[in-house]
A protein has these predicted regions:
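Active-site-adjacent loop/helix surface patches within enzyme catalytic domains
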Residues: 1-131
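Basic/polar, cationic surfaces and motifs that engage anionic cell-wall
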Residues: 3-5, 16-17, 94-99, 103-195
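Extracellular LysM carbohydrate-binding repeats and other cell-envelope/extracellular binding modules
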Residues: 228-240
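Extracytoplasmic Gram-positive cell-surface binding/anchoring modules and repeats
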Residues: 207-218, 226-228
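Disulfide-bonded cysteine-rich modules in secreted/extracellular proteins
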Residues: 185, 193-211, 240
Length: 240
């Protein structure tokens, strides 16, 4: 990811990566801008206390503008709670969020390449900030109409657009729950494959006396998930 460091007016002092709790999505509100354009502006032209960590554009480019170890001045001004806005006001702020700005989305939805870039940015952020589990809007923190066409509470067109973006990013709660379940299952399967042995290997251990005799052997094999009769049949064949 290209890094064009913003002027120091755009961010605050060093913070811990572990303090970051959420990723906030914004839009620049500008048409035809690119991630590099925005990076250069905040590096050389910006004159106010405003900034964002990463800019993502329609071509699929990400440009980092503010180090993740610094709070960008991006969600500090309260606007309104009307229409379901600002539900995280007082909980999320500049110091515990990382901000991603979507370029050229003032009048249109993000492109497929842009969505892919945002997913990459989120993955990059979470590698450094493992507690950044939420993905929210500027609207959800401060009540600002940002990211523009995706602003609004449940039942609005903006909310529908926001839910679609979350779905495209794989960030809906049910998607994340499913991901966790799949990851857990894969981990369990990998563990089983590493620790389990073939019936023939177990039969050899039985012959070597490692599983005991009689009822004790049967109990141990069954408890370990092996079919006693199958193992015993292999043992008998080996001893012929």
């Amino acid at each position: 990811m290209k890094f064009i460091r913003a002027k120091s007016i755009s961010y605050g002092s060093v913070r811990s990566y572990e303090d970051v709790k959420a990723i906030c999505i914004h839009f620049t509100g500008i048409s035809n801008d690119t991630a590099e354009n925005e990076g250069n502006y905040f590096a050389h032209g910006n004159t106010r206390a405003a900034g964002a960590h990463i800019f993502s554009d329609r071509a699929g480019n990400n440009v980092k503008s503010v180090p993740l170890s610094r709070p960008a001045w991006s969600v500090g001004i309260f606007f309104t709670r009307a229409g379901g806005a600002a539900k995280y006001w007082g909980t999320l702020n500049n110091y515990n969020t990382v901000s991603i700005e979507m370029c050229d989305c003032a009048t249109k939805d993000p492109s497929k390449k842009q969505i892919k870039a945002i997913k990459k940015a989120i993955k990059y952020i979470r590698k450094k900030c493992p507690n950044a589990t939420k993905v929210v809007r500027h609207f959800d923190i401060c009540g600002k109409q940002c990211p523009g066409r995706m602003s609004g509470g449940p039942g609005t067109k903006g909310y529908e657009r926001w839910q679609k973006l979350l779905r495209d990013l794989g960030e809906l709660p049910e998607q994340k729950t499913k991901k966790k379940a799949v990851k857990k299952a894969k981990k369990a399967a990998a563990k089983t494959s590493k620790t389990s042995k073939t019936n023939k290997e177990i039969a050899k251990e039985v012959i070597a006396g490692k599983w005991g005799n009689g009822k004790i052997r049967k109990q141990r094999l069954t408890a370990a998930g092996y079919d006693y009769d199958t193992i015993q049949r292999i043992v008998n064949n080996m001893l012929k």
